[in-house]
Amino acid sequence: MDAFVVLVFILSCLFLLSLWRQSSERGKLPPGPTPLPIIGNFLQIDVKDISGSLTNFSKVYGPVFTLYLGMKPTVVLHGYEAVKEALIDHGEEFAGRGSFPVAERVNKGLGIVFSNGSRWKETRRFSLMTLRNLGMGKRSIEDRVQEEAQCLVEELRKTNGSPCDPTFILGCAPCNVICSIIFQNRFDYKDKDFLTFMKKLNENARILSSPWFQVCNNFPLLIDYCPGSHHRITKNINYIRSYLSEKMKEHQESLDVANPRDFIDYYLIKLKQGNYNQQSEFSPENLATTVSDLFAAGTETTSTTLRYALLLLLKHPHVTAKVQEEIDQVVGRHRNPCMQDRSHMPYTDAMIHEVQRFIDLIPTNLPHAVTCDIKFRDYFIPKGTTIITSLSSVLHDSKEFPNPEVFDPGHFLDKNGNFKKSDYFMPFSTGKRMCAGEGLARMELFLFLTTILQNFKLKSLVHPKDIDTTPVLNGFASLPPSYQLCFIPV
């Protein structure tokens, strides 16, 4: 009985504390729906379609509003103007990484994606500089992507035109590009260690987008005390880091300071220069987390986009025909596509942009946070407040993209058929926290897709009108439904 009384007392205190905090904060923050104690507005959100819920709230409360996901307030920015004003015009103030409890437990504030403050700035600066040294944006990295594109084609030829699920083949190509940058070598697509590595990355992407993960992320107590798929993320990341640690040991044994071969070498040299001390942001642990971040961010996003692109091309064969006609005219059959071709292929460029716009891969972006107290549009947002930016509301803005729910490369073409840029195109986010690998990802999408379409006719197992392109998961990421197709050599 005593234990029951204590439990009731504790819950009552939490209830009253929640009421007090919410009432005192809500007067200063942007408007929003009235939250319930402890759980906040969570029951008013569809965890299977968070971006849709945010759109509905914006119709009532405007482009800047507050939600309580649990007991903490989160400010939501909806629409191009609000997102641009925050992430670009006030980029420094909105450059923090917001609350993401599962990742915080795994990464412990390390790495390039979920770190903050000076650690994030130093790690990001070093990573960008090293990627440039390794050829990012230069011909050398393009050579690697072209080489991998040919390996991808050879692997697809082995299917002999039979039905296949392209998930793992399309995942191997971008992963191998990252492998060549991180530890200099690529893997055979049938390598057992490589396939296990790929499987862990793919499983984590699915779990991150599950409704249960959204629940755990908003109620962190569940992470430690409840069973569920979220524990698989920790196990998978520990496996990936263990694998990477072995690579780091191999690099330490063969390191030549005068001739760095890859990202790991550059980082180990940084440590040898005496920068690894109690105050330094550089450490072996941060290296392992940073490399793990680069793999997670650089593999699954690109492979999912490729997978979705092929599904959309199957659904819209007239688009596929136009792209292949342009490839025949500009590239031909006797050489490999290169990045110089892109400026002469407006329809293909528009198709790839439209794929990224239409699929809306990361609908609510990774959470941001304000780095200081800030007055934003006459509202007061305290330092550390989590900020959600709805990329869906930008990529599917009907004023910029007429009929935004329709897949149409014409969204990125002018009346003369020339490629047309749009400030609303931000699948890689924007501002200080925008994707560090945007240039590489765009290169991979162009070279992999054009090389596939140069060499194969895509054949669906069902009629195009029966192909469903609705994402099966729409939490953290929009993932396409599973499907099979035939790659018919041409």
From Swiss-Prot:
It comes from the Eukaryota. GO terms for biological process: organic acid metabolic process; xenobiotic metabolic process. Its EC number is 1.14.14.1. It catalyses: an organic molecule + reduced [NADPH--hemoprotein reductase] + O2 = an alcohol + oxidized [NADPH--hemoprotein reductase] + H2O + H(+). It is found in: Endoplasmic reticulum membrane; Microsome membrane. Keywords: Endoplasmic reticulum, Heme, Iron, Membrane, Metal-binding, Microsome, Monooxygenase, Oxidoreductase. Pfam families: p450 (PF00067). Induction: P450 can be induced to high levels in liver and other tissues by various foreign compounds, including drugs, pesticides, and carcinogens. One of its GO terms (molecular function) is heme binding. Heme binds at C435. Its cofactor is heme. GO terms for cellular component: endoplasmic reticulum membrane. It is an enzyme of class 1 (oxidoreductase). Gene3D superfamilies: Cytochrome P450. InterPro entries: Cyt_P450, Cyt_P450_CS, Cyt_P450_E_grp-I, Cyt_P450_sf, Cytochrome_P450_fam2. CDD domains: CYP2C-like. PANTHER family: CYTOCHROME P450 2C29-RELATED, CYTOCHROME P450 508A4-RELATED. Belongs to the cytochrome P450 family. This is Cytochrome P450 2C26. It comes from Mesocricetus auratus (Golden hamster).
